[in-house]
UniProtKB/Swiss-Prot annotation:
This is Copper-transporting ATPase. Mg(2+) binds at residues 631, 635. PROSITE patterns: ATPASE_E1_E2, HMA_1, HMA_2. Coiled coil: none annotated.
Length: 745
């Protein structure tokens, strides 16, 4: 059984990887992925051995709060920005008290100058009050940090909590010594760390705020889509409008769409017309004109007219619901490249605590001065600096932040990745197999020429009258051509369809009811009276004389034209060093012509679904990484067999289950865009990981005091600043993907 739910209380990758590690050890858990950014988890488990309630209990034992739905954040007295501003103000106040006299004695009133026990004690008490206020503003670090420590799942908050608490306790001890007149020398008053506590917390809060703002911006793609989802719709019942919940709509319901409202579910216009904003599907800002018979998709916005539509999907299976599910899965899933960071994060925090304790002991023993309190202060500063400067967040954010921003960018291009692995793998593709009809071509064959043995208008009338009963795209091309030439429609009866061959019906022809047949050459008894040398899709029209003989009346030559810009986009793809193949069920002449015209390397014609499947198997056996690009309708086996499946779609014409990548702008440029975005994303992730590993590898030893003899020691305050800048740098570097652009050449 697969389930998705939310987890509250996670602060860094040590939290998410700790949950994964703990639950992953359970025999009944087959797979679990926890997303720190989305605060969510996807789990697959054996329902015969456990249930979701038991899994929730296991997570609660680790100190986190699992929930089936994401509860609204509790409204606090102070907003995050106000809390941050107050933290900055009180930090500056404490720094002013502790360091003002060093800059200039005139900055502080005489009563606060540390020239005697009384003023020293008063100054320290004011620092303590300021520090306690800042600690209260940053209390989440202590609540989450110590809770995680209690459950033996230490995280970034644990490091902050331990480090600042140690500094506070030491300062309180020094304050007690001053209060009890322990120091007899007026120049040997207590050494406090109240300003370090404040500065550390303030810098961490600034860093976290920048992170959260960046996360929120990156999550805007899903939020915007969810805002497009209407909660109610106007249903027509007995010529009356009734407002109903969208979840209650079933296929076949007639809905009224008012100007300015969003389409509730996928459907088809049955009365009226309108201009729809489909930018959430295609990324194109221009409105799309829709008339009777045209499909409309959930989440798109109607502009200035009202119309009636018939629902063709319920809410659960609508285009918008599928897109939201894809984005959620993409943001929640993990790329393979993140596994290394997860493994490091799982031991990172305990290792840092061990290093900090070891450094404290070593400095206490080998410190160069014989004064115990000097040695203790130095060891304590090193201990706090090591804890505070280490940055598991930089490691944890390196991959998911890039994935998050990349998915947001993809949605603006009309692209949707099924999961992070799809985004990661697209860059490795070295062979692309294209379906032809509807993928490289418009999928709407148009009549190129007509060969007729009877009056042309009569041939058009016969063919269109019969083809009107068919939903085949070729039939629609003939019907449209006849309609443009005002060919009259005839009454027909006894319609019979022979799948894969053609359609027949009784029609009034030359004053009698005759069986007229429309289809390919195999639908007729041998025809030798008309030779057609043109390349194209051949559709014959004939009269059945008897069961063994047909009379040829004429033939249509249709052509499915390539989409605009396809040739240029395939050239772009080939410039990446990727081999291209065309697989089509069309005849050899048409497929060969299409491949040569578009510059495709190889082709297979007359290909049945099994032939396409075999070709992809063959390519994979040769070590090729294969991307299959199709429309998702009749090539599902081939899509499933490929390494990366791309479905070119228009709304509900596609089932996202078959796709790794869905392009709703129905443009081959999307394939090139997906590959380039994948390359840019992985490059960005590698930059983030490189920085995160280098930062921790360099700054943790530095905080330990390895350069003490060079007079380089990091204070806890500087360590806090460095840690904040580390995670912020990863976030800002990930944001560069927002500026990703596809070059035309």
């Amino acid at each position: 059984m697969k389930e998705s739910f939310y987890i509250e209380g996670m602060t860094c990758t040590a939290c998410s990887s700790g949950i994964e590690r703990s639950l992953g050890r359970k025999s009944f858990v087959k797979k679990i992925e926890v997303s720190l950014l989305n605060k969510s988890a996807n789990i697959e488990f054996n329902e015969n051995e456990t249930n979701l309630d038991e899994i929730f209990k296991l997570i609660e034992k680790l100190g986190y709060s699992p929930k089936k739905t994401l509860a609204e954040e509790k409204k606090e007295f102070f907003s995050p920005n106000v809390k941050l501003a107050l933290a900055v103000i009180f930090t500056l106040f404490v720094v002013y008290l502790s360091m003002g006299a060093m800059l200039s004695p005139s900055l502080l009133p005489e009563s606060l100058l540390t020239i005697n026990h009384h003023s020293n004690f008063l100054n320290a008490c004011l620092q303590l009050i300021g520090a306690l206020i800042v600690m209260h503003l940053g209390r989440d670090f202590y609540i989450q940090g110590f809770k995680a420590l209690w459950h033996r799942q230490p995280n970034m908050s644990s490091l902050i909590a331990i480090g600042t608490s140690a500094a506070l306790i030491s300062s309180l001890w020094q304050l007690y010594l001053v209060y009890t007149n322990h120091y007899t020398d007026q120049w040997s008053y207590g050494h406090y760390y109240f300003e370090s506590v404040c500065v550390i917390l303030m810098f961490v809060m600034v860093g976290k705020r920048i992170e959260n703002v960046s996360k929120d911006k990156a999550l805007d793609a899903m939020q915007a889509l969810m805002k497009n989802a209407p909660k109610t719709a106007l249903k027509m019942h007995n010529n009356q409008q009734i407002e109903v919940l969208v979840d209650s709509i079933v296929v076949g319901d007639i809905l009224k769409v008012l100007p300015g409202s969003a389409i509730a579910v996928d459907g088809e216009i049955i009365e009226g017309e309108g201009e729809l904003d489909e930018s959430m599907l295609s990324g194109e800002a221009l409105p799309v004109y829709k008339k009777v018979g045209d499909k409309v998709f959930s989440g798109t916005l109607n502009s200035n007219t009202s119309f009636l539509m018939k629902a063709t999907q319920d809410n659960k299976n609508s285009t918008l619901s599928q897109i939201i599910e894809m984005i959620h899965n993409a943001q929640s899933s993990k790329a393979e490249i993140s596994r290394l960071a997860d493994k490091v994060s799982s031991v990172f925090v305990p290792s840092v605590i061990a290093i900090a304790v070891l450094a404290f002991v070593v400095w206490l023993i080998i410190a160069p001065k014989p004064d115990f309190w000097w040695n203790f202060r130095t060891a304590l500063e090193v201990f706090v600096s090591v804890l505070v400067i280490s940055c598991p967040c930089a490691l944890g954010l390196a991959t998911p932040m890039s994935i998050l921003v990349a998915n947001q960018k993809a949605s603006s291009l009309g692209l949707f990745f099924k999961d992070a692995k799809s985004l990661e793998k697209a860059r490795l593709v070295n062979t692309i197999v294209f379906d032809k009809t509807g993928t490289l071509t418009n999928g709407k064959p148009v009549v190129k020429s007509i060969h007729s043995n009877i009056e042309l208008l009569e041939l058009l009338s016969l063919a269109s009258s019969i083809e009107k009963s068919s939903e085949h795209v070729i039939a629609k091309g003939i019907v449209e051509y006849a309609k443009e030439r005002n060919a009259p429609l005839k009454d027909i009866s006894e319609v019979k369809v022979k799948t894969g061959f053609g359609i027949s019906a009784k029609v009034d022809y030359q004053g009698a009811k005759e069986i007229i047949k429309v289809g390919n050459s195999e639908f007729f008894n041998p025809i030798n009276t008309l030779e057609i040398k043109e390349n194209g899709i051949l559709v014959f029209v004939g009269r059945a004389i008897n069961e063994k003989e047909d009379e040829l009346l004429g033939a249509f030559v249709l052509e499915d034209l390539p989409k605009k810009g396809v040739k240029e986009h395939i050239a772009q793809i080939k410039n990446l060093g990727i081999n291209t193949f065309l697989l089509s069920g069309d005849n050899r002449e048409n497929v060969k012509k299409c491949a040569l015209e578009l510059g495709i390397d190889g082709y297979i014609s007359n290909a049945k679904p099994q032939d396409k499947l075999n070709k992809i198997k063959e390519l994979k056996e040769k070590g090729r990484i294969v991307m299959m690009v199709g429309d998702g309708l009749n090539d599902a086996p081939s899509l499933a067999m490929s390494d990366v499946a791309v479905v070119m779609a228009k709304g509900s014409d596609v089932s996202v289950q078959a796709a790794d990548i869905v392009s709703f702008n129905n443009d081959i440029k999307s394939v090139y865009s997906a590959i380039k975005l994948s390359q840019a994303t992985i490059k960005n992730i590698k930059e983030n990981l490189f920085w995160a590993f280098c930062y921790n590898s360099v700054f943790i030893p530095l905080a330990c005091g390895v350069l003490y003899k060079a007079n380089i020691m990091l204070s806890p305050a500087i360590a806090g600043l460095a840690m904040s800048l580390s995670s912020v740098s990863v976030v800002l570097n990930s944001q560069r993907l927002r500026n990703f652009k596809i070059k035309d050449h």
